[in-house]
Amino acid sequence: MRSLYFPAFALLGLLAGCDADKIKDVAANNACSLDGPVGGAQVHANVPFEPWGWAYNVAAGSVPKDVTLQIINAKNHVVLTAPATRVPRPDVAKAFEDSNLADSGFVAKLDISKLESGTYLIKVIQQEGNLRYNCASPNKFTIQSSKG
């Protein structure tokens, strides 16, 4: 009977390693800010839309290179996903007294011309290794579109 323990433990070890590369979602709502658009803003679908703010990884005190923004409609469906670009935010580094946050800013240029009129919010997603830090902004904004 003891001879079965080793193969069983070896198999469990292999199976546990299968999840090592899976992306893990982590809530990070205290480590970001969507500074624009401000809550209650009305934006027009035919005008360039450039949301901006800052975000970092609180646990590691780092600034993940990869940032993605998701536009989420009132039905909680993701209707647009686009990469954001990191930009300098010396004000954030100063506010947190941490020079590592000097490049914690982000900005994106999104084409929202195909979106319908309605209320939306933005989720900021940072990825570092197999961890994906999700930060949902409480700022809701309205898109005015000719599509209705």
Language model regions located:
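C-terminal motif of bacterial Sec signal peptides marking the signal peptidase cleavage site
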Residues: L14-G17
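Short, compositionally biased P/S/T/A/G/V-rich stretches that sit at domain boundaries
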Residues: A20-F49, A55-Y56, K147
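A short beta-turn/strand-edge loop motif at beta-sheet boundaries
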Residues: N57-K65
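Extended low-complexity, serine/threonine- and proline-enriched intrinsically disordered segments
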Residues: P64-A82
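Aromatic sugar-binding surface patches on proteins
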Residues: R89-K109
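Surface-exposed, short loops/turns at beta-strand junctions within beta-sandwich domains
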Residues: I112-S117
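A short tyrosine-centered beta-strand micro-motif
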Residues: G118-I122
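Short beta-strand elements
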Residues: N130-G148
